[in-house]
From Swiss-Prot:
The protein, known as: SPbeta prophage-derived uncharacterized protein YopN
Natural source organism: Bacillus subtilis (strain 168)
Organism lineage: Bacteria, Bacillati, Bacillota, Bacilli, Bacillales
Amino acid sequence: MHVVELRSTNHKDIDADFVLNAKQTYIESVLNIRKMIVNAKTEDDLHGAKIEIAALLKDLNRVLLGGDGLKRSIENNPHFRSLIHFVKNLKRHIAIEFEEFIYQP
């Protein structure tokens, strides 16, 4: 899974380029998980996809919580607001598309 590195960013660093890169990274992660599921030959392969889904959801939750304890305000940064909106929609999409991998043990 690709992870968006928030640790080194600050409020000023979240610009249109950062948000575009983050969105592309998350979309690539979802596509890679789809490939893992389609190409799975064993239960272990499917378990690997389940682990990737959990890691992606953890990263998305980290962004929604402000990412690594960073102090950022949605009202002051429209780019960050755009990223938050995208992440919320992506979480909904993941919950629907990968439901059987999220809710089954």
